[in-house]
């Protein structure tokens, strides 16, 4: 690992930047992140790079160009990571009894947070850059961190990108605690880094006048570097690790089954005592059978063995492969801590059974939520604020059972709480419903009609009570 202390030992800032990028691009974490991006796009490397090899007469391996080469890549990696990310971040984040924090973070914070958490999972770590009023996400494949050897904290960082690495110009931004500097490197002229603009502060002081419009009159910085790491779990590693082999096994077996169906003739013919027929004669004979579905054979030989024609069918093993594929699929979901929705039918499962099915997913979500809370609180500390992030997880429920439970408790709850607990009531409709109920209740009281204490009739209450 190339640390901040290693960077300081470089001959110059430009040499340190180039060394840091070069070391980062050959690290195992970077290579794993690149693989994770490919699996995330269903471009699974193992099955896509697979070729069938046979041995020639000399025993040397050669590519079998005549064999079927179907490459069926599964989409497990994207689906499982998306499931966890949507489960935890799908409803955004709120802050207990402090709406000012959410307003300060901006209306795009929830979507940026979901992206931040997703890349933290598939890469092992992702970095959030706070640009005055908006959060930007830096992936591990485009950001080289410079960590302090003694504290492990981020002291500086280098973001790098190019439309075509090695052919198009490389754009580089060097982030330090007291500002950032932009560089560019032309691959056709492998000279020193060219400074595009000198170091600038992270916060610009702008003065607006009718004559000149907005004019930058000064700069300022935060108390530290405004880049916060979020780790995918306490292991600080990609979710591809430990999952890749199971996905590859599933892909190879599934693709191999398709290739066997193409390579193996399901019906073939054995023609006996017709050795004098040439290849062309055999092909013509087979064509006549396919066309006429009739063949003649001399079964009464004159002192010689008679000829015969016998069809054979071939069946590809199916049951064993299907059972093994199902076993691997179950293992992938179990090891990943995901929810297999095929095992849940909300119409037939009780709330307790559904809750039990979410156990593994809840544990994985807890691990990611802990890391997300740490990252968000570090961001709030940078902004001089304090707050506790709260996540409302989205899960499958038995709506009929939950409605029944809520209505049984309605006598002890106020109107707004009842509406918030009902699963079939949209959140944005609650205020509108409460307002209409106030008008309705007012009309009822004017007509001297009896009104329940909380405004809700309980359909589960016995008429005799």
What do these predicted ranges mean?
Residues 1-138, 460-465:
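Extended, helix-rich architectural segments
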Residues 80, 92, 306-315, 439-440:
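Short glycine/proline-rich turn/loop motifs
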Residues 117, 122, 127-232:
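Extended, regular secondary-structure scaffolds
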Residues 5, 39, 64, 116, ...:
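Conserved aromatic-histidine-acidic binding/catalytic patches
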Residues 287-300, 316-465:
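C-terminal helix-loop subdomains that flank or include functional centers
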Residues 209-349:
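Extended, charged amphipathic alpha-helical segments
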Residues 97, 101-108, 112-113, 242, ...:
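Short amphipathic alpha-helical segments
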